[in-house]
Every structure is written in C-alpha cells, then in structure tokens.
C-alpha cells in the first residue's frame, strides 16, 4: 500500500525527468557532427625588413599541421588558414596579394565571397586566418564561432593567432617574443612558438609544427626562393624537435656565410 502511495506521489516527476533525458539524447544525436577536426592551433606570420624575408610558423595538436595551414611566396606575402578552415583561403589570399590588395581588404573580400556551404557544421563564422604582405603589413580574422579561447594580436611586422588556446596570453606572448628576439627570422618565429606554448598553447597538447620562410633568390641552389621549410609531423614534443632543426640550420647558415666566394 505504501509503495503504491509512493508511486502515485512521485510518478509525475519521474515521467518529466525521463522525458527530459530522452529529449536531450535526441537533441544530441540530431546535432550534426563536424566532418573533420578543426585546425586548432596557434600560428604567427612575420617579416624582416632588413632582409625582405617573409615567414610563417605554426604548432598544433593535429597530425601534420603544415599540410594546408601556411602559404607564402617571396616578394608577395604569406597567409595562415586555421580553425573551421577552408584551405582555399590560402591560395585566394596569395592571389589577391599578387594583385596588390591590402591584407585588411583581403580579409573582407575572402569572407564576403565565402559561400558558407556548410553553415551548420563547418560555418565560416568559425574560420580564422591571417595575411601579411611583402612590406610587413598585417591583418587577421577570428570568427565568433571559432572554438574558445580564440583570438589574434598584431605587432610590428607580425600577427599571431590561435584557437582552442589556454587564453589571450598565448598570442600576446607570441607577438612580444617575436618583437624582442634578435637574430634571423627563423629564430624569431621559433621564439614566438615557444612563448605561445609557455603561456599554455593549445589546450589539447602538442603534436606537429611547421616553419616556412621565403626570400627572393635567398634559398640554396639556383632559382630558389624558399629560405627554410621545416616540418615536424608527429611528435610528443614538436617544438623541441623544431628548435633543434632551426638551430642546426642556423649553424650551417653561419658556416656558409663564412665561405669565400669564387
């Protein structure tokens, strides 16, 4: 008898709770899953007015982050594409740079032209990209739906941007490190990546990194504008390995500069 009274008393509440659980499950299953992992990362674009070199660097908790994030051409500029990424932003940005369009206008033009074909699960509001031209002018865009923390910060001849970060300090520290570090552009980009990681970096961890530097006729051998291209695709400590490679390259560069010509 007491069990029946208990059932009568609490049955409405139990039914309501059950209906809420079922509704929540239906909502979860009806929400579209992302077709690909967002390129959650932090990157920096930089320019050295003393040499004319343009560089880009990136680190992320995805495999082979350099495959589709960084774009650069000597005497033209560089682009970084990430977050809910549309990789075509890279070549689009480079084409507009060649036409003499400013980085700020490039950002606007590309966003305006984006058809946003998958607004529910791959929206352009989640995109993040940055542009630097051959004079060091920069601009960046962080969409309101890029996974938090997401943001960008511009400095003198540089722009840093990232998403799924520990906080604003990641990009702020990257800019500070780039501006304050002496030496070749590769060392300044490397310092920026290290500073970003020291501030918390990508909250999911580390896996891959990439550095790309271009300069007109400044690469090794004939007719080569690629000064440096380094990629760590899969490592528990990609920045440690990247720094080793950058320092090894700078040692070799210093030795080559000491060789007599002719």
Across the structure, where does each feature detected by a protein language model lie?
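Bacterial Sec-dependent signal peptides at the C-terminal "C-region" and cleavage site
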Residues: 3-33, 37
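N-terminal nucleophile
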Residues: 27-262
């Amino acid at each position: 008898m007491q069990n029946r009274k208990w059932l009568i008393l609490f049955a409405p509440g139990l039914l309501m709770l059950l209906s809420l659980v079922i509704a929540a499950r239906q909502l979860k299953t009806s929400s579209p899953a992302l077709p690909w992992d967002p390129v959650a990362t932090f990157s920096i674009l930089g320019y050295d007015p003393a040499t004319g070199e343009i560089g880009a660097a990136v680190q992320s908790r995805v495999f082979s982050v350099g495959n589709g994030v960084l774009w650069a051409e000597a005497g033209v500029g560089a682009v970084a594409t990430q977050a809910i990424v549309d990789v075509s932003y890279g070549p689009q940005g480079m084409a507009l740079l060649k036409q003499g369009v400013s980085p700020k206008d490039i950002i606007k033009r590309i966003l305006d032209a984006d058809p946003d074909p998958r607004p529910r699960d791959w929206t352009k509001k989640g995109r993040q990209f940055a542009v630097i031209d051959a004079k060091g002018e920069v601009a960046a865009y962080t969409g309101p739906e890029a996974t938090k923390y997401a943001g960008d910060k511009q400095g003198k001849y540089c722009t840093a941007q990232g998403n799924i970060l520990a906080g604003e300090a990641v990009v702020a520290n990257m800019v500070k490190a780039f501006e304050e570090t002496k030496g070749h552009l590769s060392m300044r980009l490397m310092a920026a990546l290290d500073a970003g990681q020291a501030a918390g970096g990508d909250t999911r961890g580390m896996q891959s990194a990439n550095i790309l530097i271009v300069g007109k006729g400044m690469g090794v051998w004939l007719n080569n504008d690629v000064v440096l291209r380094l990629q760590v695709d899969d490592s528990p400590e990609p920045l440690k390995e990247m720094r080793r490679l950058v320092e090894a390259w700078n040692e070799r560069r210093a030795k080559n500069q000491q060789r007599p010509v002719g």
